[in-house]
């Protein structure tokens, strides 16, 4: 449960079906279903995307796989892995960084320390 994740109107339904959604996600992940990070739910505020990482890992996904679901795995599902999803020469990349390693502690993703888009640094606190 993440406080204030859902508006009051949606909260009762979310509390009822939330555990079922988590269980379904866990089953899909364990079965090898390809999972892309993101949502079109329309109930989450912009900038709260980091909470999805917490939900994914709480449902049994490894931290590393959760991070990959937001990068290379989504690029593969969209069939753009030749230009997106990795940091290497020739690829398009917007980069974010954290003070701590999110593979070791996924909750660190809520504190972005560095943002670079199209080669321009928009935030740098490290």
What are these regions (language model features)?
Residues 1-9:
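Metal-coordinating catalytic core of metallo-dependent amide/deamination hydrolases
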Residues 8-9, 13-101:
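His/Asp/Glu-enriched, well-ordered alpha-helical/loop segment
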Residues 104:
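Small/polar (Gly/Ser/Thr/Ala-rich) solvent-exposed segments
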């Amino acid at each position: 449960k993440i406080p204030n994740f859902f508006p009051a109107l949606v909260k009762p339904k979310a509390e009822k079906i939330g555990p079922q959604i988590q269980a379904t996600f866990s089953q899909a992940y364990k079965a090898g279903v390809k999972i892309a990070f993101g949502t079109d739910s329309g109930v989450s505020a912009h900038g709260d995307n980091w909470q999805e990482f917490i939900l994914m890992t709480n449902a049994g996904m490894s931290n590393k796989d959760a991070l990959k679901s937001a990068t290379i795995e989504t690029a593969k599902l969209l069939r753009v892995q030749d230009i997106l999803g990795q940091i290497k020469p020739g690829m398009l990349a917007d980069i974010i960084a954290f003070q701590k390693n999110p593979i070791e502690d996924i909750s660190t993703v809520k504190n972005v320390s560095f943002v670079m888009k199209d080669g321009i640094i928009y935030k740098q606190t490290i």
